C-alpha cells in the first residue's frame, strides 16, 4: 500500500545544520535500514535547507504493508512524524 508521511520541525532544530543530524539522516535513508524496515522509499522531499521560514516540512512517499511499519522505519529519527496517510494514484481509482 502507498502512504505519505508528513514531518515538520522548527528551522532552529533542522538536522541538516548539524553534523550529527546529517549522520542520522544518512543512516535513516541507508539502503540497509530501508531494507531491514521492509519498506520501499518511493520519494523523500524536504523544504530545508532552502526554506528560510520558521517551520520546515517533509513529505515521504513510502510503499509498506501498513502504517505501523512506516512508524517503525522512522523510529531512529529524533523527530516526530505528524501524519501517515494511505494514498493511491487517482487515475487508477477511476
Where is each model-derived feature located?
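Conserved, structured core segments of small domains
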Residues: 1-94
